[in-house]
């Protein structure tokens, strides 16, 4: 595993904006995985923070980086049903996967995946010894893939609702939180279309 002192849990890149002489935005440039707009935790609605934690890592504020109960639950399910799809990754592990183990999408064997997961678990514990939960959650919310090329909650709020993250209502916060489970499948642009004339009455 990488040395914990050498790892960086900060997001890897951000979008760049070009403006004309009058200050109007004329172009947005973003490399793959870099369409993110950083925000601080206090700018993110508490409802969204709570919803993401409830969906992604319900024991986030209780564990030390790894969720032993979640690991045991996923292990029992795998042994009894043969279904290895249930994950037990914590928010801290997911943050490491996205910002440190960036080649995880090219893993081709169970051994590669298992090796990476063990390293993630080790580093998650080390990171939580030196980093507070709020910093971890803030970086996670600025990093998470929310579909349609949006990484982080501010980019997603702009993409889906044409709003800043702090202006989202409860329903919009719930929608963003729900995307985390399957960013392509739950893309609101694909799920919600204009009502038909019949629907409009």
Protein language model annotation of sequence segments:
Residues 40-91, 151-155, 161, 168:
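Flexible, acidic/glycine-enriched loop-and-adjacent beta/alpha segments
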Residues 1-21, 59:
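N-terminal type II signal-anchor transmembrane helix
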Residues 11-14, 21, 34-36, 47-49, ...:
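Extracytoplasmic
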Residues 28-36, 53, 182-184:
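Acidic/histidine-rich, surface-exposed loop or edge segments in extracytoplasmic proteins
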Residues 88-194, 198:
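Non-catalytic, structured segments within soluble enzyme domains
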Residues 3-4, 33-41:
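N-terminal post-signal-peptidase region of extra-cytosolic proteins
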């Amino acid at each position: 595993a990488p040395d914990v002192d050498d790892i960086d849990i900060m997001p890897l890149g951000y979008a760049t904006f070009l403006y004309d002489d009058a200050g109007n935005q004329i172009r947005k440039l973003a490399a793959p995985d870099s369409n993110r707009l950083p925000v601080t935790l206090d700018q993110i609605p508490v409802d969204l923070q709570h919803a993401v934690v409830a969906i992604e890592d319900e024991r986030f504020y209780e564990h030390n980086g790894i969720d032993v109960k979640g690991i045991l639950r996923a292990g029992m399910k795998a042994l009894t049903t043969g279904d290895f799809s249930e994950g037990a990754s914590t928010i801290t592990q997911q943050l490491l996967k996205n910002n440190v183990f960036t080649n995880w999408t090219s893993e081709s064997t169970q051994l590669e995946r298992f090796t990476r997961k063990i390293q993630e678990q080790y580093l998650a514990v080390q990171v939580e010894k030196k980093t507070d939960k709020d910093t971890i959650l803030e970086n996670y919310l600025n990093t998470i893939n929310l579909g349609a090329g949006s990484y982080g909650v501010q980019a997603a709020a702009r993409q889906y609702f044409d709003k800043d993250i702090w202006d989202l209502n409860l329903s919009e916060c719930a929608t963003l939180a729900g995307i985390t489970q399957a960013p392509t499948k739950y893309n609101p642009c694909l799920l919600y279309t204009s009502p038909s004339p019949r629907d409009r009455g």
